[in-house]
């Protein structure tokens, strides 16, 4: 499914200026865990940006993810001079035209990607931007660091399809359930001691080691490598026991285990409810996941941004390949509460109207803008790198101050590419309809580093 909205005053084909803001056609992914049909935010965004999608959305199909970027598996596209180009092709084509034009004039050419971004990332688009709409739990998984990603890509290119690491941020847009990072070891041990089905799934000779990380690793790897029939039988007993409880006797963790079992009966990943932290993010709260941090998204909607990778090492809650050995060796085994990203505020705007989520990586940051009765337009600080704008809800125009053009009739689901060093403004079209916008860009961290 692609974004085909071209109802704007600024025609992508007419101007070779490197500050053109252009519409993107983006691709949805129909993974089985996604919400079905019009219940999915991804489907609503598809309907919003292209009227023709309204007849294409099928209520029996899961719409799990919307991808925005230049990943080889689902690159965004741009209509340019009556051709449909992948985002990378579009950038390269326009950059070549700009360079050729500057070579015949006294003006110097500037970079669409941004000079610092090109030095740091070359011609690779620095990030992958997504929307997720989750019906059933995603796999117990973690992402490799840069070194391991290169090794996995070289050894297993059919499984791990790129050589990049995948740090990521998930910003909740609805209540958002997740398992993330290891619980304190004392909590895990307490569950082993008090939940017989969990204890019986571990070896009788499991030794409590003084080294907490090594002990935790032995618990995890022993569980992942346990006999499948043993795990299945113990989970069945656990499910039966929890179902025998009255509803008022069950706690949130009991309900989580029952939910996971109903979705993945007999899967060892169900036991990870006792190993990983269970959290429920409120809308606007954000979770950062670095390399080697185990996690599983369970339900809800989020905006997600990451390095441009699709590398996932799985070990549970999935019918897909489980790479138990790789996962067991790559996890950090860091215990404690998950890393929530505290949004930064702009001095001239309230947290209601602006939030910047900046995790500790160079590839990306995400800004949130909200237009309402009290704040009908917002000037966007230009980034020294490329940006992708997602209109999550509402109607607006974008005034491009760098080339004195305006894009009108933007609405829910409109997605745009913004070149580096472009000044622009969001303008609310209808004061009765609030507007929510997410902007992914290269982290200001790398520009601040270069200014030191």
Swiss-Prot record:
EC number: 5.3.1.8
Localization terms from the record: Cytoplasm
Pfam families, per the entry: PMI_typeI_cat, PMI_typeI_hel
Cofactor note: Binds 1 zinc ion per subunit.
Catalytic center residues: 314
Reaction catalyzed: D-mannose 6-phosphate = D-fructose 6-phosphate
GO biological process: carbohydrate metabolic process; GDP-mannose biosynthetic process
SS bond list: none
Sites where the protein binds Zn(2+): 141, 143, 168, 295
InterPro entries: Man6P_Isoase-1, Mannose-6-P_Isomerase, Pmannose_isomerase-type1_CS, PMI_typeI_cat, PMI_typeI_hel, RmlC-like_jellyroll, RmlC_Cupin_sf
Gene Ontology CC: cytosol
Assigned keywords, A-Z: Cytoplasm, Isomerase, Metal-binding, Zinc
PROSITE patterns the record matches: PMI_I_2 (PS00966)
GO molecular function: mannose-6-phosphate isomerase activity; zinc ion binding
Taxonomic superkingdom: Eukaryota
Pathway assigned in UniProt: Nucleotide-sugar biosynthesis; GDP-alpha-D-mannose biosynthesis; alpha-D-mannose 1-phosphate from D-fructose 6-phosphate: step 1/2
Co-factor requirement: Zn(2+)
Family: Belongs to the mannose-6-phosphate isomerase type 1 family.
Chain's role: Involved in the synthesis of the GDP-mannose and dolichol-phosphate-mannose required for a number of critical mannosyl transfer reactions.
Protein's name according to its UniProt entry: Probable mannose-6-phosphate isomerase
Organism whose genome encodes this protein: Dictyostelium discoideum
Lineage: Eukaryota, Amoebozoa, Evosea, Eumycetozoa, Dictyostelia
